[in-house]
Amino acid sequence: MSKKPSKNTKRRTGKALVITIVVIVVAALIAALSPLFLPKQTADKVEGIVEKVVGMDSVVNKGYKKLLNFLKGFTKDLQAKNAPKVESARIEGLEIPAYIDGHEVVRHTGYTLSWNEQYLVADWVAYELTATELDTQEVSRSEDFRPDETVRRSSQLEDYKNSGYSRGHLAPAQDFKWSENAMSETFYLTNMVPQLQNYNGGIWLKAENATRDAARITGVVYVVTGPVLTDGPFETIGDNKVAIPKECYKALLVIDENGGVHTVAMSIPQNVGKKESLSKYLMTVDELEALTGLDFFIELEDDVENAAEATYDISYWPKSFQ
């Protein structure tokens, strides 16, 4: 006959169960609530540490993950409610960053750019991308690369010839299929930077596709994109010495249907492989501003801008950002 467990054994088992439940609850609360009080990167680190600790016990880990997923539903709702708000879901010119003294600003049909005559690349290219525009398939890719006569001094086709670098779009041609003229103007060399082909057709294309995914899901995305020009000196191509950026960036902003403002930014080095994920290069808009020396989304009210640019919520953006 098997022995019945003693009262002491039952007490020990009961205590162990209580301790296990307490550990699960505390761990899940820490991981789920940290995004409400900490910057995104710090909150991610906290969750990673907690996951390593609870992962040492399979029972605790299983219960922790179930409770964490449940709690995250509530924290996402709270984050949405606490997101900085604006009165209108559309703000005219919101995508335009602060101008740089002495730099030409050019407005084309679908985008606006700030031209850096020293480096012969744009400081930034800004445009509004909508789901409606992406659904319009009226125009095929024109491929009419050419200098931009609207600036005092443009890069030239010969600068890229046999250079080993592709003419990398900043505002992608695919985002402008809604207009033959808008599409054609994306092939101005002022909208190009020298990019390695593996980069241009690799992770940079991933960034472009992710931006389109965001526009299709949210309806409208405000986009600013360009090369990082604060980490020179730069190697150059061609007789005109077009600067080869070491990395390129994007800053994105969405205003949701309730007026909540959501931002995310990224800066991606040219030596990144095709298989790398975007998530490694995501950052806050504040961090991108510190990196580039630019000031984005200045049409927002100061308090809204400060709150929106200080953090980002990866769960708000499509899975292609991960």
Predicted features and spans:
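Domain-level detector for secreted/extracellular nuclease and nuclease-toxin modules, and
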Residues: S2-Q322
